Amino acid sequence: MKKTLLASSLAVGLGIVAGNAGHEAHASEADLNKASLAQMAQSNDQTLNQKPIEAGAYNYTFDYEGFTYHFESDGTHFAWNYHATGANGADMSAQAPATNNVAPSADQANQVQSQEVEAPQNAQTQQPQASTSNNSQVTATPTESKASEGSSVNVNDHLKQIAQRESGGNIHAVNPTSGAAGKYQFLQSTWDSVAPAKYKGVSPANAPESVQDAAAVKLYNTGGAGHWVTA
């Protein structure tokens, strides 16, 4: 767009599917309809969030019309993302919020900017609000930026809301299903694309709050809020 254009804005989501057997191949080795998959990803087709593109395990990466697309599954969970080809910044992907978060509110359930989600989700959570776009690259109306508590980084009000919805503001939160971690529930691949060099490869949950805030701001400014399910 782990929805790793980051399915959490975007750090690069996962869905639950049945089956264990599968294969791993580059897209060039597989009979994929690249044009169709690219169009579905660009339009945030909910089919990609509800089920894998095929049964079993797979790992496909391909370039199409200026973007790099990635689809993967281990036979149990599945994920997908895309980003501008050759871009070193954030990708457009999303992830499910950590399971130790507070229960979602009614207004959370209506807010979906998901590229990467834990499946299945009910019909209500698949409907975007009338005031938001269904495009994963949507950006929020500029809001006043203020340093968050425990951090000297200026974080705008929209990002603060995202952090509360993703982790309840817990910088050590970890989603045991998707592996998303930290205050903003970064997938590792997304985190590595925006984190400082010394924190690449380190779990976001182990980074200081100011580092997490700075990474989230970078992701938000380059990819918009579409990375986060709760944006």
Curated annotation (Swiss-Prot):
SUPFAM superfamilies attached to this UniProt entry: Lysozyme-like
Gene3D superfamilies according to UniProt: 1.10.530.10
Top class in the EC scheme: hydrolase
InterPro entries: Lysozyme-like_dom_sf (IPR023346), RPF (IPR010618)
Localization (cell): Secreted
Biased composition (Polar residues): 96-116, 138-153
Gene Ontology terms: cellular component: extracellular region
Keyword Nucleotide-binding (UniProt): no
Main localization category: secreted
The enzyme's E.C. designation: 3.2.-.-
Stretch list, region Disordered: 93-153
A Pfam family assignment: Transglycosylas
Stretch forming the signal peptide: 1-27
Main function: Is able to cleave peptidoglycan and affects clumping and separation of bacterial cells.
Entry's family note: Belongs to the transglycosylase family. SceD subfamily.
Protein name: Probable transglycosylase SceD
Taxonomic placement: Bacteria, Bacillati, Bacillota, Bacilli, Bacillales
Gene for this chain: sceD
